[in-house]
């Protein structure tokens, strides 16, 4: 059994190196990952709306919003630029299901895609170091900061451009709770993957190499 596990791990590493180790194809690989991130984000959003309909406040607010962690994961794993593009692509796909006007949908996409990147930049400034994906306190603080920023960005956007989205005097708090719940679940999952596999580290390394 030990020999079988060792062989399986060797094959897994070989596949990962074939995918991420070729500099010539690294940019195409990142574009593919951005596309995959967008599709997964879109699918998760639609699934969340279906499964969590009973605790939904509006089309944009839910007491458990699972895709919020994908916004963080995209940026933490793919990097600020590629990760933000992945979330933005997913938001564009969701335009086919939204009831918002197209300009308003684009503003919502901008707020959703940028909130995770802004939270990470703020954490780096506050902590004066790079975030650790295996340090639970880092991920929980990031989840809280992201939830606050995302809710405030959307509330400011809606209050300015689309007051019809203001459905409750407590909706900022509701949105923070929903985003925080989803982000914490995702942070725990990401920490487990980063601790027990090298997949996250390899993707992050390839993202940095491509950016350079």
Task: Give the location of each predicted region.
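Extracellular/secretory pathway and lumenal proteins
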Residues: 9, 166-167
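Alpha-helical transmembrane segments that form the membrane-embedded catalytic/substrate-binding core
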Residues: 170-186, 190
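Short, charged juxtamembrane terminal tails flanking transmembrane helices
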Residues: 201-212
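N-terminal amphipathic/basic-hydrophobic helices that include classical n-h-c signal peptides
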Residues: 1-15
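Non-cytosolic membrane-interface motifs at loop->transmembrane helix junctions
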Residues: 57-61, 104-106, 167-176
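Hydrophobic alpha-helical segments embedded in the membrane of multi-pass proteins
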Residues: 62-70
């Amino acid at each position: 059994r030990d020999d079988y596990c060792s062989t399986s791990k060797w094959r897994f590493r070989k596949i990962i190196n074939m995918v991420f180790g070729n500099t010539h194809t690294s940019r195409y690989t990142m574009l593919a990952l951005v596309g995959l991130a967008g599709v997964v984000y879109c699918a998760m959003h639609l699934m969340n709306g279906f499964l969590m309909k009973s605790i939904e406040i509006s089309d944009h607010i839910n007491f458990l919003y699972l895709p919020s962690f994908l916004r963080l994961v995209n940026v933490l794993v793919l990097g600020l630029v590629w990760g933000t593009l992945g979330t933005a692509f997913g938001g564009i796909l969701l335009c086919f299901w939204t009831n918002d006007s197209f300009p308003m949908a684009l503003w919502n996409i901008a707020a959703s895609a940028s909130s995770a990147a802004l939270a990470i930049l703020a954490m780096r400034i506050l902590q004066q170091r790079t975030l650790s994906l295996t340090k639970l306190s880092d991920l929980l603080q990031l989840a809280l900061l992201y939830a606050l920023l995302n809710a405030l960005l959307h509330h400011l956007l809606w209050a300015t451009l689309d007051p019809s989205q203001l459905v409750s005097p407590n909706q900022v708090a509701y949105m923070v709770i929903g985003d925080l719940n989803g982000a914490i679940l995702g942070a725990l999952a990401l920490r487990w993957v980063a601790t027990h596999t090298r997949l996250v580290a390899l993707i992050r390394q390839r993202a940095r190499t491509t950016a350079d």
